[in-house]
């Protein structure tokens, strides 16, 4: 459903979307393994051609675009986000979710995204890193949202936040 929110494509072919929030929530809510597998299923469905990405994109062609690294990083980012949530049980849920989302949902996913942009756009590490800076403010807002959403869900239905069970 987050792919249905309109995208804003930057000049180098990578769109700003709400989908990274989904990756963050996979980890904060479902935990490491379930979250990583849910994100992997999403990527597999995209590869099979389902139009789940922003703008109704799907199919193997998206894996030849500058977004390939981000897509490959989604399951790993969700896993890392969930792993941090699983390990950091002593912190308040919202704080743990926000920090986990930054570390797994931003840093890990960006590492893959930067590599993908280096390969598809023929950019240096520095050039690709500078290109992704446009995403940082929005993704930090999404990480804060992931913290609030996960905290609210934990209060309303504690058993539904599997990263804490």
Which residues does each predicted region cover?
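Residue-level signature of transmembrane alpha-helical entry/exit and packing/kink sites
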Residues: 16-23, 35, 66, 70, ...
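Alpha-helical architecture
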Residues: 17, 29, 63, 111, ...
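Hydrophobic transmembrane alpha-helices
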Residues: 1-36
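Interfacial aromatic-anchored transmembrane helix boundaries in multi-pass membrane proteins
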Residues: 2-15, 43-77
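Juxtamembrane membrane-interface segments at transmembrane alpha-helix termini
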Residues: 27-29, 49-56, 141-143
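Structural signal for the C-terminal ends of transmembrane alpha-helices
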Residues: 29-33, 80-88, 152-157
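Membrane-embedded alpha-helical hairpins and interfacial helices in multi-pass inner-membrane proteins
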Residues: 12, 56, 88-165
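Alpha-helical transmembrane segments in multi-pass membrane proteins
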Residues: 3, 23, 27, 38-46, ...
